Each structure stands twice: as C-alpha cells, then as structure tokens.
Amino acid sequence: MLPLSKTIRTLLIGSGALLLVMMLYYPFGYDQAAFSIGGDMVLKNGAVPFRDFLDTKPPFIFYIYSVALFIFGHHDWSIRAFDILFHFAALFYFYKVLVSVLKDKDHALLSCFIYVILYTTSGYWMTAQAETFAIIPSVVIFYHTQRFLSGKGKPLGNALAIGLASTTLFFLKSTLMTVPVASLIFLLMRQRDKKTYTFAFASIAATLILSALYIYYLSSVGALVRLMEVFVWVQDYGGIAPLLSWDTITSVYIQRFPWHLVIIYSPTFLAGAAICLFFIWKSKRGNKTLTDVQYIYLHLGLQALLGLLAVMYERKCFPYHYSRAYWAMTPLIVAGLMHVISYVRTVIRPNYRKYVYALILIFTLPPLYRIGSQPIRWTFVELAGMSRAQVVEDTHEHYPLKEMQQLADKYSPMLTANDNVFFWGNHVGVYFYLDKLPTTITLTNTPLVTSWSPKNWRDTMMSQLRRSSPKLFITERRDFKGFINFTEMDSWENLQAWNSLRVYLDSNYTYSDSVGVYRVFMRKTAL
C-alpha cells in the first residue's frame, strides 16, 4: 500500500484517541449498571459470582468492573475511564502485533483506526461489554499461534500464553472460545507434523488446567454447584429462540443478523474484507503458493467467520455481539480497500475517480454517521450542561435512567449506612445510585422469573430477604422484556404472581411513593 504521510498518521492517531476519550461521557447503560453492582459486591464484600449473586454472564466481567471501581471510585463514569485506558493499551498491543506479522506500520495504524470507529460508534449501551475486553486475549492467541508457525519463541511459552488467554475468554463468555478453535483449525491447516500436534496438545492442556484451577477455586468457596445450575439455565435462556426453527431462520439468520452486520460494519467495510479474502481464494484456485501475509489474512478471515457464526448461534444479534470480530475484520478491510484504491488509480480515468471515491464514502455512512450520533453527541450534551439522563429518556423511553437518579436523590437522605435495600426489577442502576449493595442473590430479576428457574434460587432469595430485613423494598413496572426472560409480565406483575414474595411485601411493608416506573415501599417495623 502507498505510505501515509506523517500528517495523515498524526491525524489518525489524534482523532482515534479523541473518539476514545469522548466515551467518558457515555451514560450508564442497562448492562453496565448490572456489571458495576456485581463488581462493587466483589470489591466491597469479597463476593463470589454465582455464589453471592446471579447473572447471565460468566464471572470475569465482574472482576474487570471491580478493578475499574477500585481505581476510579464509585462513579457511573468509572467503567468508561477504565475502558478508555484499556483500549489505549489494547490497541497499542494490537498495532505492535500487526506490525510484527504484516511488516506494514500504515496497515496496522489504519486497522486500529477503523477498530476505534466501529467500537466507539456502537454507543453507550454496547460498549464495556464482555466482548469488549476480549480483544487482548484474542490477539494473544492469534499472535502466539503465528509465532509458533514462524518458529519464534519457545513452543511451551507460546502454548502457555494461548492457554491463559483461552481461559480468560471462556470465563468472559463461553462463545468467545471460537478464537482458540479458529487458531487451532488454522494451525492444523497450515502444517501437520509431530511438533505441531505437540504444540496443539500443550495449548489445549494449558487451557484445561488453568480452567480447572479456577473451577476448583469456585468449588472451594461454595460456588461450583450454582455455577453448574447457571450453565444449565443459560442453555435454556439461549434457547428462547430455537436454533433451527423456521421462525429463527427467517427472523434471525435471514433478517436480523445480516441487517445488523451491514449497519454495524457498512457495505464498504464488508466489501473490503470480502475482496481481501476473494484474492486469497483466487490464488488458491490458481494453485499459486500463498505468501506469508496471505496466510495471515486467511487466519484472520477464519477468526472473523467463526466469531460471526457465534453471533448467529447466540441468536440475540445485539450490536455488541459483533464486536468480538472487530480485531479480525479490520486488517482484512484495510487490505481489501487498498486493492480497490489501487484498481481505481490504475484503471479508472482521473475524471471519474472522484465519483468512485464519493460512492465508497456513501456506502461507509453507517459508522461515519454514528460518530456524530454517539461520541460527538454525548460530548456535546455534557459540555452544553444538559442532563444526560434526560436525553437518554427522551431517546430511549424504556430505559428510566433519570428516574433511577431521582429515586436516589429522594431516598438516599433517609438511609443510614446500615440500612439495606431490596430491588425487584430489571434496571438495577437503582442500587448503584443509592450506593447500596444487594443482600440477596438477585441483581436483575431475570434469572428468577423464567419458567425454568431452579426453585432453590427463589428459596435462597426469600431466605436472604427475610434475614436482611431491608428498609426499602423497590419494585419496577413497565419493564417487560420478553425477548430476554420469555415472560409477558413486567416485574410488578411477576411479583404479584409469586405468592411468597407478594405475601412478604404485603405483610411487612407499606407503600411510600412512586418515582416514574418505580414503586417504593417502606418497612413497617423492625422485622
């Protein structure tokens, strides 16, 4: 590719860094609130995920949030500050790895810049997710596989690095294990000999041993049984949309998945990746020997393919699910677009080139538009002195961020340090803004309201609720999330349907007030 000027490089680095810093002003989303509360429990109470609280995500995301809160304190922007610093480090590492394997600094820089655009423009709800923090272990696996193939480093050291990274991915989210699987497939495609089989075995063994050590830890602290229960529960949770039903095929695989894919990446970026892989296929079909760089693109293409297949398997297709493949897609995008630009410069007449470039720009509009609608917008809201919570409710009427803060402003002065609070609902930022921690296993009530929820979870929650005797009992209305918990009732209706919880509330609490969707009950007497 043509070398970039020093000015262009400086602009790319500066604008990319600015986009990352703008995330500091992103509001507190639904998932970020739940992860922060779990992280706060880990930090302040030494809580163990699954044993002390339930969620649909594996445990490592809560440890990450606990680190963010430890460094920056109890603020809704703490995870944003941590995410920014994390990405500065992650992208620097990604850049160094790409330079090492591709031998092209400009290609590496453009790949990192496109990654920043894709990630920061996904918005406040879709950032700081489990997939977000998968970039470093994913790149570690990719890099150490390539190091082994090129004969660099000690095989055992490379295998241990892959094992540690794979374990991290598994406990961030099990479907992220497509990364080591893709590298293993590529490894065995590339060369098959005793040394390679030994390396593959060592990598798998390291993953199993390190995973077993963490599982042993969970067992030793009494969390393993519930971990297994959560694993079974999540299988049903993921099966809300059956894998091969006609409805899933038409609504998810044919409509939602490809539509979100195009909107997130843009037709231009997808075409760039496809063109890169097309030229590799063309070389293979012509029985030409692939270059080392083409093999690297093939490795990245396999990573992107399996990552996107995992998104289809999960069947939720939220934008953040696609972020697991950003790191693998961006070098392919750059390579493909360089092919296009080279073609335009050599084949298209100079008078028409500007029209071709304009067309390329038009087909890149989805992420470019979101630069204005996400990082720039939220920065403007903050600098203009506007209420982010009000803007959130104006644009996302079903996410009551402003009402969480209003509830906290009203009731925080009534609570002492020793007073407990119980929340029954989905939008658990209430806990965070009240600066209170759950005293039951319930963060969001999703794990307890599904038809397949284990009875012992409900029994445990009721026992903990009676023992902690919270001063406030807060429940939520109009938070129906059938696409998540497969129920047609909101949290208040679910409470009424659960006889034990309804009787407990009626017997021990009196209605105090409503703040938007939240109904607040005050304890009658000491229980």
Model-identified regions with their sequence ranges:
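Extracytoplasmic
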Residues: K57, S174-L176, Y357-A526
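Transmembrane-helix motifs of polytopic, lipid-linked glycan transferases
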Residues: A81-L102, V140
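Transmembrane-helix signature of polytopic, membrane-embedded enzymes
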Residues: K6, F94-I117, I135-I136, G153, ...
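Short acidic/glycine- and proline-prone juxtamembrane loop motifs at membrane-interface regions
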Residues: G123-A134
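Hydrophobic/aromatic-rich transmembrane helices and adjacent perimembrane loops
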Residues: T178, E314-I348
